[in-house]
A protein has these predicted regions:
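Alpha-helical transmembrane bundles and membrane-interface segments of multipass inner-membrane proteins
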Residues: 1-223
Length: 223
């Protein structure tokens, strides 16, 4: 059985780790933004290796393109976007406190890694949502530039840049199946970015080491 071990993390290490992850995420996004126009999902891919595609799409909503005004249709698109960005800011403040507390206690090694990954990913997407509308011109039908005056959207109304897709398996559901019969299905069709990957890895660490990170009351933390 393979046993994973994690080196203890201090505050400086966590900051550097988050900084490197954030730098990677933002470098990729800005490079894509300043060199390519928006692509249409499977069409005009920047890179197309079959199992992997490098694209450029902008996400106005949440994970997998879900939009808050679609879930709550009584909200306008503008209100939904502002609420979503505000929620993200509150969430990252909570994550920051949780990370600080885990570092302060010094009795857990895997939790700071997991929280640092999630924090870096959340922060990366918040930068897009808050600042990209002001920093850049539009990418629709053209390559964006740094905005010398006004950008494509006001502060807090930027779009998250996504570019990675792994369409590994494609099939058509049998006709006899109710509701989905005859429909094409692609796994994994969703387009994401490096920040989403950091969040996913962090959440997976929390799930994999759940019993060690959050042991029953009275038991000693083992990680």
């Amino acid at each position: 059985m393979i046993k994973l071990s994690f080196r203890p993390v201090n505050g400086l290490t966590a900051i550097l780790f988050i900084g490197v992850l954030l730098l990677i995420d933002q470098w990729v996004k800005i490079y894509i933004k300043l060199n390519y126009p928006l692509t249409l999902y499977g069409q005009d891919a920047i890179v197309d290796w079959g199992f992997f595609k490098l694209l450029f799409v902008e996400n106005k909503g949440m994970a997998m393109g879900t939009r808050l005004d679609t879930i709550l249709p009584f909200l306008s698109e503008k209100t939904a976007k502002l609420l979503l960005t505000s929620f993200r800011l509150l969430a990252i403040m909570g994550l920051g406190y949780w990370l600080w507390d885990s570092l302060r206690q010094k009795n857990n090694t895997v939790l700071p890694y997991a929280l640092s990954l999630i924090f870096a990913g959340a922060l990366g997407n918040i930068v897009d949502s808050v600042f990209y509308g002001v920093w850049f011109t539009s990418s629709y039908g053209q390559v964006a530039n740094w905005a010398s005056g006004s950008g494509y959207a006001p502060l807090f109304f930027g779009h998250v840049v996504d570019m990675l897709q792994f369409p590994l398996v494609e099939w058509t559901w049998p006709e006899w199946l109710p509701w989905i019969g005859g429909e094409r299905y692609l796994f994994f069709e969703y387009i994401f970015n490096a920040a989403d990957s950091w969040i996913t890895i962090g959440v997976m660490l929390l799930l994999l080491f759940n019993k060690k990170i959050f042991p029953p009351q009275g038991e000693k933390i083992q990680v």
